[in-house]
């Protein structure tokens, strides 16, 4: 253990032993990927590589389209070029929130970009445009196949200093049902696709002209979100072995429900949010009324004194509150997804 790792160990050990939603654990050595994942890249990079019109969302992008034949093709490379540094076994747990030091009113907005092997799920440009206009940091959990089918949008999110990308598995596989190599592929193929697009971005002349800003883009995602919010001990262990922090949530927007209004989303979040909360929503065609809800939520949360941060910054601000299982709001409440979706990949 390096002296830096030791300092993190001492800090998180002293922060506290438990919180209402689970145990506070120490993240034994937050690596450099987390340390630079938010706010490090210069905003000049994104402005140099894309015009305002190219960054702006288009209404037709959000539409979900079927993809036939089903796409079972792997990425051009099957794993990232550098081996991951595995996390300790104490980190093979589902992080639901963070207990911030001094009860700081921090909240992490997270948006899933999931995609299976038989569809193309789109991009909610209105939502991303709003976050940029309001200067709201956010974390996007992108599936590997989503990144491959939306390469330009992926690179824009990657280059934006407001945002960070996390791993959301290759084709939204249910890691509580999948086993062994299938889980490895869901994780590593996504890491590899991120690296492919990062290298593609760095090869562009706009990035070559800004080497310091380009280098500050994280080499790989540092956090992972389980598709369907499902996991077991084996899946948690494989995610930690891949060097990724397993991130769940403690605030549910419910935006996949078509019948839920923006105002219902606003009420749900405001009723659930606490200092250190992680909010789950969607930034593709799977979310309904998400952008409209955020138009109200962002100023409402700021009025309550909350400051928006990425998941990586939230992890550095206190002790993660983690549990040994994955669930939506109560243990066992997502077991139905195993029956409904099985492997979950299409």
Each PLM stretch: what is its role?
Residues 1-3:
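N-terminal hydrophobic targeting signals that begin at the initiator methionine
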Residues 17-111, 116-122, 154-155, 297, ...:
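N-terminal pre-catalytic segment of deacetylase/amide-hydrolase enzymes
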């Amino acid at each position: 253990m390096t002296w830096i790792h030791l300092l993190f160990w001492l800090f998180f050990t002293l922060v506290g032993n438990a919180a209402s939603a689970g145990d506070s654990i120490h993240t034994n050595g937050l690596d450099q990927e987390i340390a630079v994942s938010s706010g490090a890249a210069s905003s000049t990079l994104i402005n140099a590589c894309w015009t305002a019109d190219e960054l702006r969302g288009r209404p037709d992008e959000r539409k979900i389209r079927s993809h036939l034949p089903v796409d079972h093709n792997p990425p051009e490379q099957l794993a990232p070029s550098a081996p991951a540094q595995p996390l300790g076994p104490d980190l093979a747990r589902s992080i639901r929130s963070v207990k911030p030091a001094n009860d700081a009113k921090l909240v992490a907005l997270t948006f899933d970009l999931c995609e299976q092997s038989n569809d193309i799920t789109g991009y909610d440009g209105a939502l991303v445009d709003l976050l940029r206009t309001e200067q709201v940091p956010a974390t996007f959990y992108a599936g590997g196949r989503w990144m491959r089918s939306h390469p330009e949008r992926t690179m824009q999110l990657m280059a934006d200093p407001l945002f960070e990308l996390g791993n959301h598995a290759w084709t939204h596989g249910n890691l509580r049902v999948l086993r062994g190599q299938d889980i490895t592929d869901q994780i590593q193929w996504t890491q590899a696709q991120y690296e492919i697009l990062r290298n593609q971005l760095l090869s562009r002349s706009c990035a070559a002209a800004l080497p310091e800003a380009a280098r500050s883009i994280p080499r790989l995602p540092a956090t992972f979100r389980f598709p369907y919010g499902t996991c077991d001990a084996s899946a948690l262990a494989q995610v930690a072995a891949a060097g990724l922090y397993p991130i769940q949530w403690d605030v549910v927007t419910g935006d996949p429900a078509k019948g839920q209004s923006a105002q219902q989303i606003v009420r749900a979040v405001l009723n659930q949010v606490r200092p250190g909360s992680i909010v789950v929503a969607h930034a593709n065609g799977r979310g309904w009324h998400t952008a409209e809800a955020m138009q109200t939520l962002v100023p409402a949360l700021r009025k309550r004194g909350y400051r928006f941060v990425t998941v990586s910054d939230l992890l550095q601000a206190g002790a993660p509150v983690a549990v040994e299982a994955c669930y939506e709001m109560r243990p066992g409440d997502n077991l139905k997804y195993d029956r409904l979706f099985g492997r979950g990949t299409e």
